Amino acid sequence: IHGLAEGDRIFVEHYVGCMHCEWCRAGEYRHCELTDWRTNPDGRRYGYTSSDNPGRLWGGFSQYMYLPWNAVTHKVPDGVTAELAGLVTPLSNGIEWALNAGRVGYAKTVLIQGPGQQGLSQVVASKQAGASLIVVTGTTRDASRLQLASDLGADAVVDVLEEDALARVLELTGGKGVDVVLDCTSGAGTAPVLLGIDALKRREGVMVTQGEEAAFPDFPLKKMTEKCITLASARGHSYRSVELALEQLASHRFPLERLATHSFGLEDVDHAIRALAGETGEDALHISLKPWGDR
């Protein structure tokens, strides 16, 4: 691959673009038809492509990976450990969703729903962008993650099972509501979206939401229209966001190493997956899989 040499430490994006369409030329490989497995049954993407396909090694659960000529790679800066480099995907998503999709910037007020990898990454992105107020919501079982959100720069955290989240947001904003809502809840149903719509300012608020498998009957379009809310979707990241994530990790400005809560060897990959899925009671926030052990 052009620009790489043996011994380079690299981060490989999961997109495998064609490199000549309008999206690839703009560094938006996520939108390339060649790598979109949803619409292209022959699409290639690391972590999604079966080992039955040519190249075989299309994932990270191995000691080697197959890199075709069109693999999208980034050099990892010196001083960024393998565990930190493993945070590039959630952090680049956080940068993409908060700054580009959500338009978070100087003096903006932000509500982030869900203190997982993506939510905490958006705390960092919003803080770095100059947001004047960052509120993070979660549940009682998220107590340690809400504390981490505070340590990363959130101005207030709310346990939605113990407090009236909307009332708290309005209290913190003098009754105005926030400029931006970033919904990072997964499998929480429609309640977070409804809360986000109510918590936004009356005019020109922005809500960024994810939920590829979610359905929303009776969506409150009338309320969105009345409040002039812009709804944006969260999906993946651009090349530029990955570069910014690597720069952020190299700066060591935030204690991002605290997101890398667990580490396992290749022989424990099944346990690692179950731990991340919440099946083992370990509260794994982000897991590092080390195919070569501690080498």
What residue spans do the PLM features occupy?
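Glycine-rich beta-strand-centered segment in the early N-terminal region that forms part
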Residues: 1-25, 29-30, 77-79
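Iron-sulfur (Fe-S) cluster-binding segments and ferredoxin-like electron-carrier domains
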Residues: 25-44
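Mid-domain Rossmann-like dinucleotide-binding core that forms the NAD(H)/NADP(H) cofactor-binding site
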Residues: 63, 71-72, 77-163
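Glycine-rich cofactor phosphate-binding loops and adjacent beta1-alpha1 units
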Residues: 101-106, 128-129, 135, 143-147, ...
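C-terminal hydrophobic helical "lid"/dimerization subdomain
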Residues: 162-164, 171, 175-176, 191-198, ...
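Rossmann-fold dehydrogenase core element
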Residues: 205-208, 219-259
